[in-house]
């Protein structure tokens, strides 16, 4: 090969390498979300605010539950999705650690664990706490003086008529229903649980509100907007069984390195999402039937994050 041919070959290699880099940088950021109401809301908010800041995305909202989402991001099938700090206890088998009951400490712990093991980066969290809860129909709670899970456990011990609507994840995970049962000394029989497809509390709350199949209680989240409006009361958790579940965007390090401004773009939005704000936004979807993307867009426009 003479010098001219060598030079031509080198130029071709350089051109191909440049094309490859450009193709990678032009590839859209794959944004996923969980299947529940708040997952859809947060997923759409992330997509809208990133697009508004010139970051190309592929919207993969409503993929599945925590297990599905974790599998997708660790396998590189998605780049980013909103997760909850308290799920670190389940993901990394640290359910017994008290660190998850503290918002800041729990965030720092999961941030370290996920980066060290999976090179997944936890960005700034929201101040909200979307923890798991059990909500009971108001007339049942009033008639039996049920205000806390301690009250509920004692009432169930006397043979109280109770049937819970919940997701499979809530029923199966050791840090969910099982943790409540252990802490408050009750055990539901299979016929006392109606397991519903997906993980959407809009469905479980509706089942309790409509007394579907005899249901009079529901799995709920701390930021659900439909609980009180549909005549349910959340049982207080005086023993603090559940971790703090602060929503936060998590992203593969490789994807973040390609566009570092993602962290800066998402931080102001998540800072605005306190508990009452998320309850109000979730209610628009759960109660008013508004589309999650519309609710997300309207909120971002009202805060000046979207034109």
Model-derived regions, located:
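Short helix-initiation/N-cap motifs at beta->coil->alpha
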Residues: 37, 59-71, 168, 189-206
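Short, polar/charged alpha-helical segment
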Residues: 37-56, 178, 182-184
């Amino acid at each position: 090969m003479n010098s001219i041919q060598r030079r031509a070959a080198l130029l071709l290699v350089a051109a191909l390498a440049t094309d490859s880099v450009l193709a990678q940088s032009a590839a859209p950021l794959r944004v996923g979300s969980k299947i529940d109401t708040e997952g859809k809301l947060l997923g759409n908010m992330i997509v809208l605010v990133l697009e508004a800041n010139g970051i190309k995305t592929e919207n993969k909202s409503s993929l599945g539950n925590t297990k599905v989402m974790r599998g997708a991001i660790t396998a590189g099938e998605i780049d980013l999705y909103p997760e909850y700090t308290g799920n670190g206890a389940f993901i990394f088998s640290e359910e017994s650690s008290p660190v998850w009951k503290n918002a800041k400490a729990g965030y720092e712990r999961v941030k370290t664990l996920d980066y060290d093991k999976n090179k997944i980066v936890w960005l700034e969290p929201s101040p909200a706490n979307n923890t798991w809860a059990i909500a009971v129909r108001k007339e049942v709670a009033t008639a039996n003086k049920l205000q806390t899970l301690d009250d509920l456990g004692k009432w169930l011990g006397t043979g109280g008529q109770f049937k819970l609507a919940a997701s499979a994840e809530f029923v199966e995970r050791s840090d969910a229903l099982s943790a409540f049962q252990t802490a408050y000394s009750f055990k539901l029989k299979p016929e006392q649980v109606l397991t519903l497809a997906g993980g959407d509390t809009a469905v479980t709350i509706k089942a309790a509100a409509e007394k579907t199949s005899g249901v009079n209680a529901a799995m709920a989240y701390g930021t659900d907007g439909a609980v009180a409006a549909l005549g349910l009361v959340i049982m207080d958790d005086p023993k603090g069984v559940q971790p703090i579940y602060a929503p936060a965007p998590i992203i593969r390090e490789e994807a973040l390195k390609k566009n570092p401004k993602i962290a800066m773009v998402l931080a102001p939005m998540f800072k605005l999402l306190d508990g009452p704000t998320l309850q109000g936004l979730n209610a628009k979807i759960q109660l008013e039937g508004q589309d999650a993307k519309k609710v997300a867009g309207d909120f971002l426009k009202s805060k000046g994050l979207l034109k």
